[in-house]
Amino acid sequence: VGKVIGRFDPTPSRTPEECERHYTQVHVRMAQDLLRPMPSLLSYYTDRAVAQADVNGGWKQRPRAWRFVVLRFTPGSTLAFTAEQNEMVAQDHVNCLYRLRSCDVEENVLLDRVDGQLALTKFMIEADRATGVDADGAWDVFRALADRVRGVMDGAFGARRLIVNRVLNEVECEPLDVEGQRPIGLLDDTTRVGYLEAYFDHRRWGEEALGVLAAGGALGDPALVGVNLLRIEERAPLDVTG
């Protein structure tokens, strides 16, 4: 399956409230209209960071992330907008977002106990590699972190699914009114390492199981920077997987 995970912040040229309003009421609807006719599209999910694990093992830290987008395609396919559609999307970024980091990823399902549930709570871990650390070395550390999470979830009440995503590349973006709004190609190199997506029946079970991973700064490693453990509000504007 082809998969893209994008990350972005609310543009500083608008208030956070206006960015949220425009993104949910305008941008997502536009994306639905553009993506729905694509025969290769499997799903389009929007993720909002609503909480972050803190050094006490609780969830009182203000999230260091705003929103993510997760797109899945049939094998061998990826996002395929026309030049005109790409420009329309980029121009709309001005109204709500910047610092876009869109990455093709390779996913590996480490745990899957989903069986008919219609509502789940999502958690995510993101990471970049530190200066001077090569991509393979950073990935080894991140994969070891994924194994730690798997170990926690194996015996955790309400744990349903764990996916580890290795970043393959990152889109290069140029500014319109501020940085990171118009995609123009691929970066020669990316510092983004990967994403972990963890699903539980309820936020309580996920917070109780995963919060301990951040206690005392235990998520830290010299090979990684920007390691954030987030609780996510996920929506599915499009899903044709059945």
Which role does the model predict for each range below?
Residues 1-242:
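Macromolecular interaction modules
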